[in-house]
Curated annotation (Swiss-Prot):
It catalyses: ATP + protein L-histidine = ADP + protein N-phospho-L-histidine. GO terms for molecular function: ATP binding; phosphorelay sensor kinase activity. Homooligomerizes. Interacts with KaiC. Participates in the KaiABC clock complex, whose core is composed of a KaiC homohexamer, 6 KaiB and up to 6 KaiA dimers. SasA and KaiB(fs) compete to bind to KaiC. GO terms for biological process: circadian rhythm. Member of the two-component regulatory system SasA/RpaA involved in genome-wide circadian gene expression. One of several clock output pathways. Participates in the Kai clock protein complex, the main circadian regulator in cyanobacteria, via its interaction with KaiC. KaiC enhances the autophosphorylation activity of SasA, which then transfers its phosphate group to RpaA to activate it. In addition to its output function, recruits fold-shifted KaiB (KaiB(fs)) to KaiC to cooperatively form the KaiB(6):KaiC(6) complex (independent of SasA kinase activity). It holds the Pfam family KaiB. This is Adaptive-response sensory kinase SasA. It comes from Synechococcus sp. (strain CC9902). Its EC number is 2.7.13.3. Keywords: ATP-binding, Biological rhythms, Kinase, Nucleotide-binding, Phosphoprotein, Transferase, Two-component regulatory system. SUPFAM superfamilies: ATPase domain of HSP90 chaperone/DNA topoisomerase II/histidine kinase, Homodimeric domain of signal transducing histidine kinase, Thioredoxin-like.
Length: 383
């Protein structure tokens, strides 16, 4: 909560509706800093609410996307949403101050000339136009969020289907027994059931509800992923190297989503690594805030001009051989997941020397207990 300014000033009550991972974003951290440090001419009160804990706020304030900042007082209520909440707020504060001065003097503005040639009616129309533009931007954000979620979930559906198909093939060839086969299929069906619930959530555009960050052993998750992909690399004489320190700290992340990122990166590495090649999975913690995960391969590499584009939505690079189909939506999904966790993802590659994808994950620091302070003070990972 922010309480700014001497008593006796007009109250400015704000409600910030944002999930835990959103509070670490640059815009919201800048917003809190602005409210704490700047003299806005109001007695400022800021409350923070997590929509995953208080979903009724989304309906109460008719929010279609978060994060959102709501001005509760002075009336009328206003809602700011999107990726530039701070700039929107800075644009409106002077207007609120002017309205407060006029109200304090007991004046009632009429359609008389203001600011030289602009009438009060014109100013009101301008304000209404700004509100309409804001609502339009919010709707556009909602549509884009729905598209991203649909692509993410649709892409993720391939993983359990592929695993179930491989298990069926292995069982027919006598490589696994019936108990092992049933165990694999059962777990994959459970995954698809969870994904079907995600698809239902897409219609509400509540991205944060698809993530459940918690204390997580990333080394164990990576071991499960490597075992799951075993059939893909054993038959091709591809060596998998791992470098994971025994003292690797636990991370604060969603288990399903981290598994999805590792699967995507390792599948891409296997796709582009030829027979007899190698893939390296490494994890390290250079600071007390971030674990750095790298997946490197000995494939053909990625052209310099494409290394930024591969993380964009709807970008698919041309295939490099009959066996590969090009980097698709998987990398854009990885980027979204990593960024929602507050981290970064990037690639280092040279032609004919392979590619190395690296992403960062926040270290567990009791976020589930005191998440408010933790995420507000947490910065972005260094490259």
């Amino acid at each position: 909560m922010v309480d700014d300014g001497p008593k006796g000033r007009q109250q400015l009550k704000l409600l910030l509706v944002a999930a835990r991972h959103q509070l670490s974003g640059q815009d919201l951290r800048g917003l809190v800093h602005y409210l704490e440090r700047e003299d806005l001419g109001f007695e400022v009160t800021l409350q923070v609410a997590d929509p995953t804990q208080q979903p009724e706020l989304l309906e109460l304030h008719r929010l279609v996307v978060t994060p959102a900042l709501i001005k509760l007082q002075p009336s009328p209520k206003q809602v700011f949403a999107g990726s530039n909440i701070l700039q929107q707020l800075k644009g409106w504060v002077p207007r609120w101050k002017q309205d407060g001065v006029v109200s304090g003097l007991g004046l009632s503005l009429r359609p008389t000339e203001l600011d030289g040639s602009r009438t009060q009616k014109e100013l009101q129309l301008e304000d209404q136009l700004l509100v309409l533009r804001q609502e339009n931007e919010t709707l556009i954000d909602r549509i884009h969020a729905q598209e991203r979620l649909l692509r993410m979930v649709a892409h993720e559906l391939r993983t359990p289907l592929t695993a179930a198909a491989l298990a069926l093939q292995s069982q027919r060839l006598g490589q696994i027994d019936m108990d092992r086969f049933q165990d694999v299929v059962t777990r994959r069906l459970e995954e698809m059931e969870a994904l079907s619930k995600d698809l239902l959530e897409v219609g509400t555009t509540r991205w944060e509800t698809l993530f459940n960050p918690q204390r997580l052993d990333l080394a164990s998750v990576s071991a499960e992923v490597i075992l799951e992909l075993e059939k893909l690399w054993l038959g091709r004489n591809v060596e998998i190297r791992t470098d994971i320190p025994s003292d690797l700290p636990k991370v604060f992340a969603d288990q399903r989503r981290m598994r999805q990122v590792l699967l995507n990166l390792l599948e891409n590495a296997l796709k582009y690594t030829g027979n007899g090649g190698h893939i390296a999975l490494s994890m390290l913690h250079r600071t007390n805030q971030w674990v750095e995960v790298s997946v490197c391969d000995s494939g053909p590499g990625i052209p310099n001009e494409e290394q930024q584009r591969i993380f964009l939505d709807r970008v698919r690079l041309p295939q490099t051989s009959d066996r590969t189909t090009g980097f698709g939506v998987g990398l854009s999904v990885c980027r979204r997941i990593v960024e929602v966790h507050g981290g970064r993802i990037w690639v280092v590659s040279e032609p004919e020397e392979g590619a190395c994808f690296t992403f960062t994950v926040p270290i567990w620091q009791g976020q589930g207990q005191e998440w408010g302070q933790a995420v507000l003070t947490e910065g972005q990972a260094d490259p």
